[in-house]
Amino acid sequence: MTSTTRDVLHKLNFSIADASPEYIDRRKLQMAKFFTFAALSIFSTRFIYKQTIARQYVPLLFQQNHQPPTSYNFTADAMVAVGAGTLACGSISGMLMFGTAWILDVSNLKEFGYRMKALMGGDVKEKELSEMKMDDETRALQDGLNDLLEGKI
């Protein structure tokens, strides 16, 4: 980010003007992922729309309108529908996922877990639970499980 850009951001009172270059690059990457999936979503839905219009059967005068023509290939139509539906579902899901990650400022699942725990109050409950006294039976059970996991038994 150039100094003139930072000056403009300071003038407009944006807090990102004081951010580190690593943070700015991270946010740019999150934004790029979101917009990539948004563009893919637009492309896939437009593709589905065009395929639907192209396959629409419009009968000529005095032709039956309740039966498709005999040259119609149901297998190919089903394959295109499954592929296009999968593409649309994947791209929209990706857009939703990366948009949420961009809004919450998370880059991986571990950060997402920490953020959700903090938003739902789980970190406070976990701290309270860790500060509680542990009785002897629970401590013995915990030590036994730790020994089992570490391979001491």
UniProtKB/Swiss-Prot annotation:
Main location: membrane
Protein name in the entry: Altered inheritance of mitochondria protein 11
Family: Belongs to the AIM11 family.
Domain of life from the UniProt record: Eukaryota
Lineage: Eukaryota, Fungi, Dikarya, Ascomycota, Saccharomycotina
Organism of origin: Lodderomyces elongisporus (strain ATCC 11503 / CBS 2605 / JCM 1781 / NBRC 1676 / NRRL YB-4239) (Yeast)
InterPro entries registered for this protein in UniProt: AIM11 (IPR038814)
Transmembrane segments: 31-49, 82-104
Subcellular location: Membrane
GO cellular component: membrane; mitochondrion
Keyword Repeat: no
Membrane is among the record's keywords: yes
Bilayer topology: Multi-pass membrane protein
Gene of this entry: AIM11
Keyword terms, alphabetized: Membrane, Transmembrane, Transmembrane helix
